[in-house]
Each structure stands twice: as C-alpha cells, then as structure tokens.
Amino acid sequence: MRVNCVGAIIFDASDRLLLIKRGHPPGMGLWSVPGGRLEPGETDEAGVCREVLEETGLEVEVGRLAGTVDRPGPGGVTYVIRDYLATVSGGVPAAGDDAADVRWCDRADLVRLPLSEGLLESLTAWGVLPPN
C-alpha cells in the first residue's frame, strides 16, 4: 500500500532549516522537516500548510516541489513523500502534535543531529541547501 505524505523545507533569513524532532513512530527521536500524511481529498498544498501549523505553530506559503522520496514502512507500506519549499507567513515556532521539539538548524546541526534516514542526502541532491 502506498501512503501519500508531504513535507515542508523552510529556511529563515539566516539560511537555517526548520526541523522537528519526531515524537511518535515512524522516526521517533529523529529530526526531520515538518510533514506527514495527507488527509482524504486534501491537496498537497493544504496538507503542507496543515502539517506545518500542527507541528510547529507556523503558517506558511507553499512554493515549488523540491523532490519526492519513497520510504518503506511497516507491514509493506510505502510512504510517498513529496517535499515542498515553503516560507513562513506567520506564527511563532512551538512544538505541537507529534513533534517533540522544533528548531532552526544550521549546517553544523545537520551533520550533528540524528536525522531521518536519507534527509540530508535528499536535500543535497535536490540542491535546496544554502551554500556553506
């Protein structure tokens, strides 16, 4: 079974990436971009906005598709994750929903923190990370 998911790649004015620490499986304890499963009938854009608001307290404007990855899940599930660039339009970062923590991360953090599998490689391959 394929499960459609979305994620948001959000940078601040200092080129730091917004990451959340997953509070529940899959990926509990790992840092990732905000995102999750689409609700039935929900568009990608609406899903990105909802997930970011639920997990971080931030309102966003959704930009272009950065890339897509397939991730295996339990019981033969495949998570099809479409990650979009987004910009903050309102709110103050605060962990919520299934996020245990939320923070702006620089390049050093991306190397040091335990990230979701393939996150750094995907962001690099898609060319969305700011220069060192």
Protein language model annotation of sequence segments:
Residues 16-54, 58:
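Conserved Nudix-box catalytic region and its N-terminal flanking loop in Nudix hydrolases
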Residues 16, 91-94:
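Short helix-loop capping/hinge motifs at secondary-structure junctions, enriched
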